[in-house]
């Protein structure tokens, strides 16, 4: 585990928990931060797929992942409306439902770190000799799902 990433992860987790608890929503929250092995595997996989990460161009955006799981589809939309109050959304990918196929709808959002989180990230980076830090973005992935899509 990379301690600085865990500190950032825990802060994001708590911030989301505090905001969602204010509205009395029923949900579950999961989080993880990538360890060195996982980061290196992802870098290798993307390179073998012909889509390598590049410094200052194509960066890993999910060193931290947060998943909010709600009981109802409408609650996913509610969470998506509420969280921009406390998080900075950068990009999103939302599945378009097919009327003839039963499948979960994925909502994945890339969020920017706060200034304080960037400071922690940069402190970890400055004390590390690992070159992969140049391939890491100061963002995290937020996934919104329903219980049904969790299987």
Show which residues each predicted segment covers.
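Nucleic-acid processing machinery
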Residues: 1-151
């Amino acid at each position: 585990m990379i301690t600085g990433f865990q500190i950032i992860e825990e802060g994001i987790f708590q911030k989301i928990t505090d905001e969602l608890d204010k509205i009395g929503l029923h949900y579950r929250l999961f989080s993880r931060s990538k360890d060195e092995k996982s980061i290196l595997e992802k870098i290798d996989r993307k390179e073998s797929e012909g889509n390598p990460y590049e410094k200052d161009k194509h960066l890993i955006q999910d060193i931290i992942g947060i998943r909010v799981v709600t009981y109802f589809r409408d609650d996913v939309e509610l969470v998506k409306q509420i969280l921009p109050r406390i998080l900075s959304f950068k990009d999103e990918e939302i599945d378009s439902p097919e009327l003839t196929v039963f499948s979960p709808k994925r909502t994945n959002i890339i969020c920017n770190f706060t200034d304080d989180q960037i400071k922690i990230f940069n402190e970890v980076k400055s004390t590390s000799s690992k070159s992969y830090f140049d391939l890491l973005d100061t963002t995290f992935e937020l996934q919104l799902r329903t219980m049904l899509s969790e299987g």
